[in-house]
């Protein structure tokens, strides 16, 4: 968990 993906949520 250290990447910025194209997701509507952030874990």
Swiss-Prot record:
Q: Which GO terms describe its biological process?
A: symbiont-mediated suppression of host cytoplasmic pattern recognition receptor signaling pathway via inhibition of MAVS activity
Superkingdom of the organism of origin: Viruses
Recorded family membership: Belongs to the influenza viruses PB1-F2 family.
**Record's miscellaneous remark:** A stop codon is present at position 12 leading to a truncated form of PB1-F2.
What's the protein called, per UniProt?
Putative protein PB1-F2
Gene encoding this chain?
PB1-F2
């Amino acid at each position: 968990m250290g990447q910025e993906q194209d997701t509507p949520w952030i874990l």
